[in-house]
Every structure is written in C-alpha cells, then in structure tokens.
Amino acid sequence: MAASKPVEAAVVAAAVPSSGSGVGGGGTAGPGTGGLPRWQLALAVGAPLLLGAGAIYLWSRQQRRREARGRGDASGLKRNSERKTPEGRASPAPGSGHPEGPGAHLDMNSLDRAQAAKNKGNKYFKAGKYEQAIQCYTEAISLCPTEKNVDLSTFYQNRAAAFEQLQKWKEVAQDCTKAVELNPKYVKALFRRAKAHEKLDNKKECLEDVTAVCILEGFQNQQSMLLADKVLKLLGKEKAKEKYKNREPLMPSPQFIKSYFSSFTDDIISQPMLKGEKSDEDKDKEGEALEVKENSGYLKAKQYMEEENYDKIISECSKEIDAEGKYMAEALLLRATFYLLIGNANAAKPDLDKVISLKEANVKLRANALIKRGSMYMQQQQPLLSTQDFNMAADIDPQNADVYHHRGQLKILLDQVEEAVADFDECIRLRPESALAQAQKCFALYRQAYTGNNSSQIQAAMKGFEEVIKKFPRCAEGYALYAQALTDQQQFGKADEMYDKCIDLEPDNATTYVHKGLLQLQWKQDLDRGLELISKAIEIDNKCDFAYETMGTIEVQRGNMEKAIDMFNKAINLAKSEMEMAHLYSLCDAAHAQTEVAKKYGLKPPTL
C-alpha cells in the first residue's frame, strides 16, 4: 500500500485500521513530517498530522518570534515556571500612574496602607500562615482605592494564592476572576484560575484560561503547556467515549479495504475463491453474488468481496455462523475483520476469541485471528496483551510470514528496532517476494540510524530503499516510505518524485495526495498547491479522515477557525477507533478555545 500515514506508528495495518490518529499513545519523536511524536508504519492505514503538548495550539511558531513584545508588567507575565508565591508591589500599567491633583495625597495614603497590609500578608504567606495572610489581603482589598485596578488585581491574586494553599478551589477561582476583570491579561491570575478550574472539573473553562496563558506567554512556559495538553486529552477522551459508543458504523473506501488486505499473504479469508466454490453463472442485474455451488453464507460473502460489494459481507457471514455451517470458523474471522474495518472492536473481539479457541480450525485462521486481536490490543494501548497474542501466533504457526511482518511493526512501535528487523528478516526468509516487508525493514533501519544520528547507517538505509524500489518497482509502499525518509534528509525534489510514483501505481489512494500536499508546504511553502492536493484527496475518497484532519490543521494556521472546526468534525465522524476520535476532539477543542480567547482578548491569529 502506498503512502498511508506519515509512517510513524504501525501496528494497525494488521488489525484495527485507522486513517486518523494511529495506534500508540505517545512514543518518541522521529523522522517524518516535522518530527512527529509517534512512529507509524502503517501498511493500510493513513496517519494524522500529530501534535505534541502545546503544539496543538498552532500559533506557537509565530508567537515565539515575538519575544514578548508589547507585554507590560501589568500582565503578570514571567518566564519562570514557579507560580506559588504571592506578588510584591505591582507595577502600574502604562497610563495608570498615581493621579495628580487635589485628592492625590489621600489616595496615596490609602494605597500605602493597602500595600502595607499586603506586605504583611506576604510575610504570613511565606511563613505558611495562610488564614492570617488571607485576612491581610482582604484588608488590602478594602483599603485600596477602586480606581487602582492593577494594585487591586494583585491583592485578589495574592488572596487566591493563599486560598490555593488551603485547597479552597471555589474561592481561588472567584478571586482570580476578580483579578482578571481588573487586569484582563493578568497571566498569573489566569493560570491560577485554570488550575482551580481543573480541580473543580470545569474542563472547558480550564482550557480557555490555559489557552490564553499559552498565547500571552508565547508558548514559552512548560508548566502551562503541559496543563493545556492534559486538559485537551481529558476533554478528548471524555467526548470520544460518549460519541464513539453511539456512532454509526461506516464502511471505509474500497481502496482502504484493498490496501488493508494487501498486508496479509497467509490469510485464507482474503484469498480469491477457488473454481469449485462458485458456478459460472453471470451475476444478475441487481448485483447479487454469483451463485455458489454450496448454500453457504460465507462463500457468498467471499464473492461479495471479489465484487467489492462490502456492505453485504457481515450479514452473509452471520448466516453461516447462525447455521453452524461448514465454514463457520472462516465466517467468524471474516466477520470480525469487517467489524474491525468499520471500527467496531467490541463486536470483533468475541468472534476473534472464538476462532482462536477452535482447536480444530485451520491453524492459519487461528494465527490470523491472533494477529488481528494483538493489533487491536495495541491500538487500545495494551502492549502486553498484544505481545502475548503475536508470540502465541508465532508458536502455533511458525511458518506464517504474516506473523513476523506484523509483529515487526509492533516492535517498531515499542521502540524495539533490532527485534523488528529480525522479524522482518524472518518474514523475508519465508516470503522472499514480500516487497512490503523489505521496504519496512529499510524504514526500520533508517529510523534506527536517524534517531542515533548515525550518518553512515542513514546512507546505508537510503541505499537499501533504492534497491527495494529497483527490485519491486510495483510496490507503492516502497516509494512512500522512501519519500518520507528523503523528506527527512531535505531531498524534497526526489521525495516528490517518489510520491508521483505512488500516485501512478495507486491513483485512488487518497493519503498519497495528502503527503504530497504536505511536502509542498514544507518544501516550497506553496500553500495553494498543498491545499489543492489535499482537496484532491477528499475528492478521491470522501471518507479519508486523514485529509480532513490535515486540512483542518492547515486552516487553523491560516486563522480560518470555523473551517478548521468543520474539517475536524468531519474527521471525527469518520474516526475508526475511540482513541483516534479522542485525538481529533483534542484538535477541535483547541481550535474552539483559540476562537473564544481571540474574541475575549482581541488577539488576531497569525496566518501562514
């Protein structure tokens, strides 16, 4: 399969296909589009433009260049990450100096008394006497002239800090709100309120506050970035859990399904029907399957597969299973596979469990079920169960090349590159004609060399890619993986040629167009051409969530938040796993939060 995902994470190609966020829940940064945080090898699935902590906020690159221009002390903006201590005397905002005139002396005395009370409170605070500190800050608030907004905001923020030490989160939020009302860009108060909202489980409010903090700080403070990432993940998981259980199953595109099955060579259920299994009668005008010589739901399902009439497969398999027919084990495995393809892992697991437990079933059926269940476990972030299933598959069917091929992908995801290469070697020994395994072995070696910064090994891996595409000129995946390695090496022109080869071989593979579009942005900063190619991907396959997600990400960077949110929502509706959906909700929520913060604080998003 060509240009599936940014080749970073991996194992889903074997089981729960996901053209969105991929498999793992983290991992190390590696080569690919812009140092993405996860590796996805992906034979049959397209991966997303993944974003790490804080990077979801796509203003960071531009904001960092501004080096705190236009930020006065009144904002409370500081570069250190420690925020627990109260503040000393606040500097007035520009234009808010002490008034001159008849009442100036009285105001100064009132302000001085307020400052003295605050200073006394600070001493109590540092001594751990928070109740006494609160009394002093309350006195400062009552003494302070009402027109002294900046000073008043500091007193409220200091009192909030004392309430925070007593874990009185409601009072913390209330005092921080007062401080922000008086000084809208008061970073320290905004962040303290964000933490209080987190404790009160007010995730939406927490996200808006911490988003404002990240923007005002220019994405320079790790503490606020981590909180932003944390709350986005929590919101994403919460929303995905509710949405996913009520989602309508959706069959992926024919290209996606064919690519998925192409990653298996020892899979009985995906092999063409034998001559004895069907008659020579033509199919009727209604598109019904060719008559099979046996009254078998499974054989009808197989015929529908050959006709790419995928929507009827699950029901025909169910007929075979209900009748306890001759092909019951095959029907269970085929039904489970299509449950996985439509993103219904809960329905797939019982079928896979049953096939695995059928000792009398063909060993290749049981091994294939173990591969798919193991890959499903990996997508659910259960690596121990996943590893157990792959090892069991190798034990019961040691001559099955698929076991080593897909276990190799698992090992890459687990950062066990040497073991991955050994598995790919075993797959190649068993199936010398396996172009996919040879291409993925090259990529595993390349990744190892890249992360180890070993230039000679990088060159050896690049030479290996050349040999693979020369030996297997019809393997689109070889060109796709090579293109991603070339992109890492800044060889953009040659990478573009490799993507063109992929498109020639698989013109209906939408993900290749997305990768080629991203390359135009990285290589030539050609936004129009990049968007044209991603739009072409959607035209080819309107179920390609990778394309919608990437389009949404670019629209955020262009400042088109409404369109970005629309793209993310389309991707959410196409997500094939709860984890993928949670990731997409995080992107969508980040865009929503930036929109609200921009309105509230008058911040105009920078554009590409």
Curated annotation (Swiss-Prot):
**Topological domain spans for side Mitochondrial intermembrane:** 2-38
* Membrane topology classification: Single-pass membrane protein
Q: Name one GO biological process term.
A: response to thyroxine
Effect of substituting residue 195 to A: No effect on interaction with HSP90AA1
| A Pfam short name | TPR_1
The chain residues annotated with the modification Phosphoserine are: 91, 96, 110, 434
| Ranges for the TPR repeats | 114-147, 153-186, 294-327, 329-362, 367-400, 401-434, 440-475, 476-509, 511-544, 545-578
**What one GO molecular function would you report for this record?**
mitochondrion targeting sequence binding
Annotated InterPro entries: TPR-like_helical_dom_sf, TPR_rpt
Q: Which domain of life is it from?
A: Eukaryota
Supply the alphabetized keyword list: Acetylation, Host-virus interaction, Isopeptide bond, Membrane, Methylation, Mitochondrion, Mitochondrion outer membrane, Phosphoprotein, Repeat, TPR repeat, Transmembrane, Transmembrane helix, Ubl conjugation
Q: What GO CC annotations are associated with the protein?
A: extracellular exosome; membrane; mitochondrial membrane; mitochondrial outer membrane; mitochondrial outer membrane translocase complex; mitochondrion; TOM complex
Give the sites modified to Omega-N-methylarginine.
71
Give the span(s) annotated as Disordered.
67-107
| Crosslink site: Glycyl lysine isopeptide (Lys-Gly) (interchain with G-Cter in SUMO2) | 275
Kindly list the residue ranges recorded as spanning the membrane. Answer: 39-59
Compartments annotated for it: namely: Mitochondrion outer membrane
Do you know which Gene3D superfamilies this protein is assigned to?
Tetratricopeptide repeat domain
N-acetylalanine, modified sites: 2
Q: What does this protein do?
A: Acts as a receptor of the preprotein translocase complex of the outer mitochondrial membrane (TOM complex). Recognizes and mediates the translocation of mitochondrial preproteins from the cytosol into the mitochondria in a chaperone dependent manner. Mediates TBK1 and IRF3 activation induced by MAVS in response to Sendai virus infection and promotes host antiviral responses during virus infection. Upon Sendai virus infection, recruits HSP90AA1:IRF3:BAX in mitochondrion and the complex induces apoptosis.
The UniProt entry, under PANTHER family, shows: MITOCHONDRIAL IMPORT RECEPTOR SUBUNIT TOM70
This chain's protein is named Mitochondrial import receptor subunit TOM70
- UniProt lineage: Eukaryota, Metazoa, Chordata, Craniata, Vertebrata
